[in-house]
Amino acid sequence: MINIDELKKKIIYRSNYRGTKEMDNLLGAFTKKYINNLNENDLLDLEKLLNIDDTNLYNFYNGFKTDFEFETNNINSLYKNFDYKQK
């Protein structure tokens, strides 16, 4: 059985400490907005999303060509359509 609270903590940490400031900010804001509204399957999909390298995540978000085949699921759709306003 999955410990949802532990999974959320892991996801929050990984979202905010990616390696590039741009992706730290983008994924951190995305996770902060949605983390408490996600079901177990969505959390597992978000964990899978975080396993993708920053370049492909950035390109996918911005509609550029990627070297990765993104699944069609709720998380990828939310991420692709996330309205990130950098401060």
Feature names for model-found ranges:
Residues I2-L43, E47-K87:
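Positively charged, polar, low-complexity stretches
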